[in-house]
Curated annotation (Swiss-Prot):
GO terms for cellular component: cytoplasm. InterPro entries: PCRF (IPR005139), Pep_chain_release_fac_I (IPR000352), Pep_chain_release_fac_I_sf (IPR045853), Prokaryotic/Mito_RF (IPR050057), RF-1 (IPR004373). Keywords: Cytoplasm, Methylation, Protein biosynthesis. Belongs to the prokaryotic/mitochondrial release factor family. This is Peptide chain release factor 1. Methylated by PrmC. Methylation increases the termination efficiency of RF1. GO terms for molecular function: translation release factor activity, codon specific. The modification N5-methylglutamine is found at Q233. It is found in: Cytoplasm. It holds the Pfam family RF-1. Peptide chain release factor 1 directs the termination of translation in response to the peptide chain termination codons UAG and UAA.
Length: 358
């Protein structure tokens, strides 16, 4: 581990030199790439330097104990050693996490797709609840959201809603939302007071750049039509709505949220790139799992990941066994407690895998 940390520190120092090189300063691509690489290494290098400083202080303190000291001073040195050893242990654990392989998509924007599943209108209302939950969470993180496509229902729910979340690190936190979300509550239309169970599915896709997912123009069929509102009524006499079909994969994306056909096509292309990338990633994962004879775990969107129980004001994340009695706050966008627990669980599993591999 420490050989790797030395190599990281050397690379960081080399990047500092490169970023002061006039040839790099005058090359926008190199400047951007080196700056990003340096930023990615900064926390690891700072933590490693703090670790080395603590080790040095610890060695000095232990050396002092070899000398003749007054009892009171000796006790103070022992206390300092205890504190430094505790800090050293914490820094080692932090460095282990920092050295884990990074998800290359973590810093990207996100395309989120929420669809009503089992439960009819109640599922559509729940899809609307989830959409509002995520937009409020995004706002609390300083991220911006933008609707790409929506199919609203008459009672204020959504059969489907697709929206963009723009912000640094959005995917690193929202990627854990992939899966089936279940709600248990008494519908307003239920006279007998019986609890109904409904579900909605959430897909969280990283936004992909054109250079990352190559799509040939000949592989796309573009259809245009008049946009429509709830119930199918036309809301636009111009042919502004766009449907893109990726012929090789059969993936279809529609967008009619904008009045401009050009803007709708741009939004649809973003979703198409993300879905194609996700399809290839899922195929690669499935092949890997089959080779290793591993069962597909998190990331399988048919898997029920979380239950929202209204009568008990309870949210349970089934993947990590976390239950909190704060449903009202969670639906108001206060997702930090759940997401941070999921991140810690993910890191723990990666550390176990790294230890097993070594």
């Amino acid at each position: 581990m420490f050989d790797r940390l030395e190599a990281v520190e050397q690379r960081y120092e080399k990047l500092n030199e490169l970023l002061m090189d006039p040839a790099v300063i005058n090359d926008p691509k190199k400047l951007r790439d080196y700056s990003k690489e340096q930023a990615d290494l900064t926390e690891t290098v700072q933590t490693y330097r703090e670790y080395k400083s603590v080790r040095s202080q610890l060695a000095e303190a232990k050396a002092m104990l070899e000398e003749k000291l007054e009892p009171e001073l000796r006790e103070m040195v022992k206390e300092e050693i205890d504190e430094l050893e505790e800090r050293e242990e914490a820094l080692v654990e932090k460095l282990k996490v920092l050295l884990l392989p990074k998800d290359p998509n973590d810093e990207k924007n996100v395309i989120m797709e929420i669809r009503a599943a089992a439960g009819g209108e109640e599922a559509a209302l729940f899809a609307g609840d989830l959409y509002r939950m995520y937009t409020r969470y995004a706002e609390s993180q300083g991220w911006k959201t933008e609707v790409i496509e929506a199919s609203p229902t008459g009672l204020g729910g959504y059969k489907e809603i697709i929206f963009m979340v723009n912000g640094k690190g959005a995917y690193s936190k929202l990627k854990f939302e992939n899966g089936a979300h279940r709600v248990q509550r008494v519908p307003e239309t239920e006279s007998g007071g019986r609890i109904h169970t409904s579900t909605a599915t959430v897909a969280c896709l990283p936004e992909m750049e054109e250079v990352e997912v190559e799509i040939h123009e000949k592989d796309i069929r573009v259809d245009t039509y008049a946009s429509s509102g709830p119930g199918g009524q036309s809301v636009n006499t111009t042919m502004s709505a766009v449907r893109l079909t990726h012929i090789p994969t059969g993936i279809v994306v529609t967008c009619q949220d904008e009045k401009s056909q050009i803007k709708n096509k741009e939004k649809a292309m973003k979703v198409l790139r993300a879905r194609i990338y996700d399809k290839y990633q899922q195929e690669a994962r499935a092949e890997y799992d089959q080779t290793r004879k591993q069962a597909v775990g998190t990331g399988d969107r048919s898997e029920r990941i979380r239950t929202y129980n209204f009568p008990q004001n309870r949210v349970t994340d089934h993947r990590i066994g976390l239950t909190i009695q704060k449903l009202d706050l969670v639906l108001d966008g206060q997702l930090d407690e759940i997401i941070e627990a999921l991140i810690l669980d993910d890191q723990s599993k990666k550390l176990e895998q790294a230890n097993d591999a070594s």
